[in-house]
Amino acid sequence: MKLSLIFILAYLIGSFPSGVIIGRVFCHKDPRDAGSHNIGTTNSYRVLGPIAGTAVLFLDILKGTLAASLPMIFHTSNHSLVLVVGLAAVIGHAYSIFLRFTGGKAVATSAGILLAYNPLFFVIASTIFISVILITSMVSMASIIGPLLIAILSFYTHDWLLGTIATLVLIFLTYRHRENISRIKNGTENLVPFGLYYRYKQKKRQ
């Protein structure tokens, strides 16, 4: 019974719509009304501005970390359950009960789970994420390559549970980014205003 309640609580934590709350309360905007209409960090940066976007990023990471830490907080099981419970927060973020089962793509929330489970891998994942953005100028590309490399690294270090969960997250994030992947193939994906590929595109237009 306690474990079931923990999963429900993790889902509810993940369901907290950080982007919508910050947008409405502090910016008097709803990120769902502009840009990509997504409630996550990237669109929050675009619609609400860098300060609000950064706040959304940290809150979404915190959601994953807090939800994944519930088994330890309630002393219910071993450290491995952190990853499994964390998945409930990912589902909550993507299909929030507070937003009629719509939501974001759960990249930051997934990273928060990794922070709770293995802080070193979180740092590695963050470094990969930033590096890919600086090269490709695409958040969507970084959102897929990051978990892919973490899954490979996990299997290489014989952390089979993390490797399995990272693979599941990779599949889920790939599905959530299916429209972005189509735009990448067509050469029409949105770029952040920095990075090597962005500079290349700017020079090409001149």
Swiss-Prot record:
Q: Where are the transmembrane segments?
A: 3-23, 47-67, 79-99, 119-139, 152-172
Q: Which GO terms describe its molecular function?
A: acyl-phosphate glycerol-3-phosphate acyltransferase activity
Annotated Pfam families: G3P_acyltransf
Give me any GO biological process, just one: phospholipid biosynthetic process
Pathway assigned in UniProt: Lipid metabolism; phospholipid metabolism
Q: Taking the first listed entry, what is the main subcellular location of this protein, grouped into a coarse class?
A: membrane
Catalysed reactions listed for this entry: an acyl phosphate + sn-glycerol 3-phosphate = a 1-acyl-sn-glycero-3-phosphate + phosphate
Highest taxon of the lineage: Bacteria
Read off the InterPro entries from this record: G3P_acylTferase_PlsY
Annotated membrane topology is: Multi-pass membrane protein
- Assembly, per entry: Probably interacts with PlsX.
Q: Which HAMAP family match?
A: PlsY
Q: What family, per the record?
A: Belongs to the PlsY family.
Q: What does this protein do?
A: Catalyzes the transfer of an acyl group from acyl-phosphate (acyl-PO(4)) to glycerol-3-phosphate (G3P) to form lysophosphatidic acid (LPA). This enzyme utilizes acyl-phosphate as fatty acyl donor, but not acyl-CoA or acyl-ACP.
Which protein are we looking at? Glycerol-3-phosphate acyltransferase
The organism is Latilactobacillus sakei subsp. sakei (strain 23K) (Lactobacillus sakei subsp. sakei)
Q: What is the lineage of its organism?
A: Bacteria, Bacillati, Bacillota, Bacilli, Lactobacillales
This chain is encoded by the gene named plsY
